Regions:
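A C-terminal-region feature
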Residues: 112-113, 121, 133, 141-145
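Ampipathic, surface-exposed secondary-structure segments
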Residues: 102-129
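Structural detector for internal amphipathic alpha-helices that build alpha-solenoid repeat scaffolds
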Residues: 1-5, 26-36, 58-89, 115-125, ...
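Alpha-solenoid HEAT/Armadillo repeat architecture
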Residues: 18-19, 34-35, 106-109, 123, ...
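Short capping loops/turns at secondary-structure boundaries
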Residues: 66-70, 94, 108-112
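Eukaryotic acidic, Ser/Thr-rich intrinsically disordered low-complexity regions
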Residues: 147-187
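Short inter-helical turns and helix N-cap capping residues of alpha-solenoid HEAT/ARM repeat scaffolds
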Residues: 21-22, 52-55, 108-112, 145
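Amphipathic alpha-helical scaffolding segments comprising HEAT/armadillo-like alpha-solenoid repeats
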Residues: 4-18, 38-58, 84-104, 127-140, ...
């Protein structure tokens, strides 16, 4: 919990964010501050996302080896939202996380990392401003199940809860069903 983090530790990480010359150290400081609900961290993290290639390879997926850096950023941003909302600033947090989360959705259109936490966030909070981005995401990845199978199903599940007409129309257009994308576990 953020209240358990000593103020001197927060200040030390802020100094790293401002004074370090290394991009890696700045990124890790920004991610940590973001997860603690510190706005300076979120701003710096979003700035680092402006050149995605500089972050690629920071984290690898533990099973499949693809770049998982943006999934890690996603976790920090959703924690940011939770921490700021817990302080009573839900509307402020909602506005502040919109840009980084939509950037993550857009990057995920062409990269294999998972964004299921965004779908959970959107469904749980009923933040419909994300729907155009999620619709576009599904439209772009649905023809590439070899890369995005789990993500396709996750996006379908999300949109079935919030915009089922869109999902059914897209599936009909592609001559597919939800079952065509349901993940199965090989035995």
């Amino acid at each position: 919990d953020p209240e358990d983090i000593p103020l001197n530790r927060i200040e030390a990480v802020k100094e790293l964010l401002l004074d370090t010359v290394g991009d890696d150290e700045r990124f890790f400081a920004a991610k940590l501050l973001t997860s603690w609900g510190i706005h300076e961290g979120l701003v710096a993290l979003e700035r680092s996302m402006e050149s995605p290639e500089s972050l690629e390879g920071t984290y690898s997926h533990r099973l499949h080896g693809y770049d998982d850096t943006y999934c890690q950023i996603l976790m920090a941003v959703t924690r940011y939202f939770a921490n700021v909302a817990d302080r009573g600033d839900t509307d402020l947090a909602r506005a502040q996380v919109f840009s980084p989360l939509t950037k993550i959705i857009e990057l995920s259109n062409s990269k294999p990392f998972e964004i299921g936490k965004i779908f959970d966030f959107v469904v749980n909070e009923k933040y419909l401003e994300y729907l155009p981005y999620i619709r576009n995401h599904l439209s772009l990845i649905i023809d590439h199940p070899d890369i995005h199978r789990w993500k396709i199903y996750d996006a379908i599940e999300c949109l079935l809860k919030l915009d089922s007409k869109f999902v059914m129309s897209l599936l009909k257009e592609k001559n597919k069903t939800v079952e065509d994308f349901r993940p199965s576990v090989a035995r």
